Amino acid sequence: MVALGAVVLALDLPGGQLRWWYLAAIILSLAGDVFLMLPESAMDPELSFVAGLGSFLVAHALYVVGMVLLGVSGGWLVIGTVAAVLVIVTVGRRVIAGARATDRRLFAPVMAYVVVIAVMIATSFGTGIIVGIVGALLFGFSDSVIGWTRFLRDFPHS
């Protein structure tokens, strides 16, 4: 994440604000990684999970702001919205239900996170920028595997 932050600082990004939205998102993603890696002796595991989830949720919302600043095309946004709805219908709803069954207090944070990931996927398509689309889809896939493993059952080799 530190290397990604350095890349964002080094790139010649359009518009003056874009760099700072993305840098803030990367810093929050780093914080999310740290929260999720904390040993049980350092912090309660459920609190650590919610703090990590919250950090990533805000980071993804900042990525969405950055993508909107880049510009979003209606046609591509429709395609992205269809992709995002498919993610919610196929995986998201089951992960949300699993979170509720595991601990009712996790229902709202996990649901909010699934929605933000879906919005990020849709918005990435809206930019029409392939690297952004691939990045958002990889985030969505990775987080789907994590959610599935945590709340439903183990994924082989995950």
Model-derived features with residue positions:
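Polytopic alpha-helical membrane-helix bundles and their juxtamembrane interface segments
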Residues: 1-158
